[in-house]
Amino acid sequence: MEIGQYQPNLEGDGLRIGIVQSRFNEPVCNGLADACVEELERLGVSGEDVLLVSVPGALEIPLALQKLAESGQFDALIALGAVIRGETYHFELVSNESGAGITRIGLDFNLPIANAVLTTENDEQAVARMTEKGRDAARVAVEMANLTMALDQLGDDEDEEEDEEDEEERA
């Protein structure tokens, strides 16, 4: 049996990407953003198609993502932040709530969101992971934007077939 399969597409040309970056643990978040933007450019996303906004901390990321999603101007969004256990007593709350909010926005708006909010035990772990996680967020956003657009076309193709069948029945 032969089955259809969608191949991952990392071509970023023409995609519009919104990035929300936390300023808490700023050196790590700047490292995430630098790596992310560099990778978006490498994948063909134009600088004029990227909007980067910053928020005070990880708990503010979901609201900013929601506003970007509501605008309808983006093919994918990216969340960048760093929650480090050693620096906050409410590590679990911030980690869990920001993650749940990011996921909810993506599902509510049917919009891919690459979540690169690092949750680490210490600064050293965050610094060690920031570059690769920033790059990975860019790749996830581009791949998922392309995938969701391709899957949306499946529905469009089915609608066109139904319209053609309806026209044939009326004729």
UniProtKB/Swiss-Prot annotation:
Record-level GO BP terms: riboflavin biosynthetic process
Pfam families, A to Z: DMRL_synthase
Residues annotated to bind (2S)-2-hydroxy-3-oxobutyl phosphate: E87, T88, R129
Coiled coil residues, start to end: none
Region of interest (Disordered), ranges: 150-171
Keyword field: Riboflavin biosynthesis, Transferase
HAMAP family: Lumazine_synth
Protein's gene: ribH
Keyword Nucleus recorded: no
Active site (record annotation): H90 (proton donor)
CDD domains: Lumazine_synthase-I
InterPro entries attached to this UniProt entry: LS (IPR034964), LS/RS (IPR002180), LS/RS_sf (IPR036467)
GO cellular component entries: cytosol; riboflavin synthase complex
Pathway the protein takes part in: Cofactor biosynthesis; riboflavin biosynthesis; riboflavin from 2-hydroxy-3-oxobutyl phosphate and 5-amino-6-(D-ribitylamino)uracil: step 1/2
Reaction catalysis annotation: (2S)-2-hydroxy-3-oxobutyl phosphate + 5-amino-6-(D-ribitylamino)uracil = 6,7-dimethyl-8-(1-D-ribityl)lumazine + phosphate + 2 H2O + H(+)
Protein name, UniProt field: 6,7-dimethyl-8-ribityllumazine synthase
Family, as annotated: Belongs to the DMRL synthase family.
Molecular function terms from GO: 6,7-dimethyl-8-ribityllumazine synthase activity
Protein's organism: Burkholderia ambifaria (strain ATCC BAA-244 / DSM 16087 / CCUG 44356 / LMG 19182 / AMMD)
Enzyme superclass (EC): transferase
Binding site for 5-amino-6-(D-ribitylamino)uracil: F24, A58, L59, E60, A82, V83, I84, N115
Regions of compositional bias (Acidic residues) in chain numbering: 154-171
Function: Catalyzes the formation of 6,7-dimethyl-8-ribityllumazine by condensation of 5-amino-6-(D-ribitylamino)uracil with 3,4-dihydroxy-2-butanone 4-phosphate. This is the penultimate step in the biosynthesis of riboflavin.
